[in-house]
Regions:
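Boundary at the C-terminal end of the N-terminal hydrophobic targeting segment
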Residues: 16-18
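N-terminal helix-cap/turn-to-beta initiation motif at the start of protein domains
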Residues: 20-34, 174-189
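Edge beta-strand at a domain terminus
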Residues: 93, 98, 103, 127-172, ...
Length: 310
């Protein structure tokens, strides 16, 4: 994947001058939601969570020749009366392309009703689409137009709750055969509660053998952490991989490591990974994950979500 942002934005060559404009993140609400487009370097999928707690957060997926070329997580954050953008890129296995440290923030340069420019990055809004103009040094510019895909999401019957809500794989056991289409019901924009605060997830639908999602956790009107998540086809089955990030996108895991949850079993509207469960409910979506305790023990933590309404 070329070393350019997968963001719904474009690279510019000139740095910012003067003081950054004073604003909050609310004027960028139009970026929220799902976007898709094609360009010379392949297909770009993006899903942005709307403004909350002074931030926006997005997941990006690049597809080339029918295969995932890489993922990225991006945030736009209120800072010192203005905005900064941060971006971290990863390969198809969620191995990092940068260090574990938080990426250098890009200051806001200008903002209007139809355009936003950060240091080195620009996006132009044109009707119902976003135009990316990528000016890559020593290379030809790339232009990509992203539009909102039309999604028909069929009704998904709720799954039957099981006890215990989280299962763990038996030593030496194999994961069952499965394709990402089996968890297509995970796609969408979800908001709810978990870990004593607000939890939000946005999932891109299946493509090129993967789903990709972003998580934002908020407690006390402050972001506590983010996650970049994927569900991928691996060894004839599925695995959920994720990476955690501090509010400045400093990685909790080392760049080459992602937390992995192999599939244990799946049903039409539930997926039981090793230590993590997703299932559809009558109200939306429920997730359970085994979390560690300070005394070395563990306990299951519940997250419950409803579809975000426009």
């Amino acid at each position: 994947m070329p070393r350019v942002p997968l963001l719904c934005l474009a690279l510019l060559a000139s740095p910012a001058l003067g003081s950054p404009p004073r604003t909050d993140v609310e004027p960028l609400r139009w970026m929220a939601g799902e976007w898709q487009g094609d360009g010379p370097a392949g297909r770009v999928d993006a899903f942005w969570l709307p403004p909350a707690a002074g931030t926006m957060a997005g997941v990006l997926r690049r597809i080339r020749d029918g295969r995932v070329a890489g993922y990225a997580i991006a945030t736009i954050t209120e800072q010192d009366g203005s905005l900064v953008l941060r971006l971290k890129r990863f390969d198809a296995q969620l191995a990092g392309r940068e260090s574990q440290d938080g990426p250098a923030p890009r200051r806001l340069v200008s903002l209007s009703d139809t355009e936003v420019t950060f240091e080195g990055i620009h996006v132009h809004r044109s009707g119902d689409s976003i135009v990316l103009d990528l000016d890559r040094p020593a290379d030809r510019p790339e232009q990509v137009r992203l539009t909102r895909p039309t999604r028909h999401r069929p009704a998904v019957p709720p799954s039957v709750a099981e006890t215990p809500p989280v299962v763990q794989a038996a030593p030496g056991s194999d994961s069952p055969p499965a394709r990402v289409s089996a968890v297509a019901w995970l796609g969408g924009d979800w908001t709810g509660q978990g870990l004593g605060g607000i939890s939000e997830e946005a999932w891109l639908p299946p493509a090129a053998g993967s789903l990709a999602g972003v998580y934002r956790g908020v407690r006390g009107a402050q972001v506590s952490f983010y996650e970049l998540m994927t569900v991928v086809e691996a060894g004839g089955s599925l695995a959920l991989r994720l990476k955690h990030f501090a509010p400045d996108l400093r990685g909790w895991e080392s760049p080459e490591r992602a937390v992995q949850f192999p599939l244990v079993r799946a049903a039409p509207s539930s997926a039981y990974f090793d230590g993590l469960t997703y299932r559809r409910t009558a109200d939306g979506l429920e997730a359970w994950v085994v979390v560690g305790l300070g005394d070395g023990g563990t306990r299951p933590e519940r997250f419950f979500y409803a579809p975000r309404t426009p």
